[in-house]
């Protein structure tokens, strides 16, 4: 069995390749931009960090926001690829609410050299400022982390 560091390195390369392919196939995606995110999760209890890319509206106010999150703690490293869609509610204020969800692929690497790949689904709600700052709450079902509280920034 390969060392954990090698497996993580290979997985991260695959995940980044998938994310780059998603970005490369979208012609108008540059209109919205990339972003960074971080926060805490419950079950597993972890700190997480990652990145995302938000597309322009696909229809009405529905955006595609795929993201990659890496969680550390609770004797496991979690790498999640989330294929999330968000609907942004109309607002005249500097803050706007949004809600959404989407499927996830979760890679779990345990301290005892075991690993698992599980599918999941996330539901999310959040608030974003027009400048790009956002706060988000995710609820995971199936085999996604149960709850995530996050903050992030989308570069516009």
Model-inferred region functions:
Residues 32, 45-49, 75-81, 95, ...:
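Residues that define the transmembrane beta-barrel architecture of outer-membrane proteins
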Residues 100-105, 119-127:
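Hydrophobic alpha-helical segments of small multi-pass membrane proteins
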Residues 32-42, 61-72, 99-107, 132-142:
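Transmembrane beta-strand segments that form the barrel wall of outer-membrane beta-barrel proteins
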Residues 1-32:
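Cleavable N-terminal export/targeting peptides
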Residues 37, 50-54, 84-86, 124-128, ...:
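Outer-membrane beta-barrel architecture
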Residues 11-12, 19, 49, 121-123:
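Residue-level marker for the onset of beta-strands and adjacent loop->beta junctions
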Residues 50-113, 155-156:
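Gram-negative (and chloroplast) outer-membrane scaffold detector with strong preference
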Residues 122-156:
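A charged, solvent-exposed segment within the mature domains of Sec-exported extracytoplasmic proteins
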């Amino acid at each position: 069995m390969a060392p954990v560091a090698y497996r993580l390195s290979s997985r991260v390369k695959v995940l980044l390749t998938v994310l780059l392919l998603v970005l490369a196939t979208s012609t108008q995606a540059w209109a919205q931009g990339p972003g960074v995110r971080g926060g805490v999760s419950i079950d597993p209890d972890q700190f997480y960090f990652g990145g995302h890319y938000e597309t322009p509206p696909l229809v009405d106010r529905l955006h595609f926001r795929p993201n990659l999150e890496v969680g550390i703690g609770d004797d496991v490293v979690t790498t999640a690829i989330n294929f999330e869609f968000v609907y942004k509610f109309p607002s005249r204020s500097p803050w706007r609410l949004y809600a959404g969800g989407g499927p996830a692929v979760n890679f779990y690497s345990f301290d005892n050299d075991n690993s698992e790949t599980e599918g999941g689904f996330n539901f999310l709600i959040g608030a974003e400022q027009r400048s790009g700052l956002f706060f988000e709450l995710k609820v995971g079902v199936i085999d996604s982390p149960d709850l995530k509280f996050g903050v992030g920034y989308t570069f516009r």
